[in-house]
Amino acid sequence: MNSSFSLVFHSLLYATPATLVVALITWRIGVRFHKHDVVDTMWGLAFIAAAYASALATQGHGDSTRRLLLLLFVTIWGLRLSTYLALRNHGLPQDPRYTAMLSPAQGSEDWYALRIIYLLQTVSLLFIGLPINFGLVSQGKIGLVGGVGIILFFVGFSFESIGDWQMRRFKSHPENKGKVMDQGLWRYTRHPNYFGDFTLWWGLFLISAEHGSGIWALPAPIFMSWLLIKKTGKPMLENQLQQTRPGYRDYILKTSGFFPWPPKR
């Protein structure tokens, strides 16, 4: 166990600067275009950078199949998410949620953004990614628990991807401007993308925690779940949508807030 913890710590020594480089580059882009919601695009790419830096730091350790799966899963999730968000946000004004976050800034808004948005998200990201660090050095073969984790990852990835695709298609029709999306997966949960993120990260945790000391990374998916359900995900978005989307309050009354469930009649 002590060996696992020392390897995880060693991997973080590589993952931290790799993630900071991505954050600083993204911050410079945000400064250049006066648009700090670009940090959303950083999220997936920074996880990829952290995962590969950690893998580099722990070469020769851990089960090779688990290492390969974790890197593959983080890569396809991160690339899809960052690509989708970059395309979605291109040409749009800054997300009002980030404008509100930056409103207390005294002096340079850009330096305030670096501290409050980019560096804070970097710390959160490194913490949320701890299951990956533990999983990369786990020696045991993938068994039943890991298999359940793989299934959860694909269920979550499918929910997130399909939900985003359905929303993008809905918004592509001019006649839907200002309307509430309540079709497809959005009929069963107000946030299929957040539910997907929640599910796939619990899946990654199970893959990583099946053997050895990976169970110590349990606070990471709990923290991620709290962010999505109680803090920066669902609550902030719904507060904004209730003010900007007529009919969203009715949508809330009939549609499950997070976990998929048939709508109320």
Range-by-range predicted roles:
Residues 24-35, 83-88:
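C-terminal ends of transmembrane helices
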Residues 9-23, 46-81, 85, 120, ...:
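Hydrophobic transmembrane alpha-helices
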Residues 32-33, 105, 245, 255:
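A broad structural signal for alpha-helix termini and local helix breaks/kinks
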Residues 81-134:
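Hydrophobic alpha-helical segments and helix pairs
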Residues 1-9:
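Short, strongly hydrophobic alpha-helical membrane anchors
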Residues 32-38, 58-63:
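Helix-loop junctions on the outward
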Residues 28-29, 101, 241, 251:
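Broad structural signal for hydrophobic residues in well-ordered alpha-helices, predominantly aliphatic
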Residues 33-49, 93-116, 179-186:
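Juxtamembrane helix-capping/reentrant segments at transmembrane boundaries
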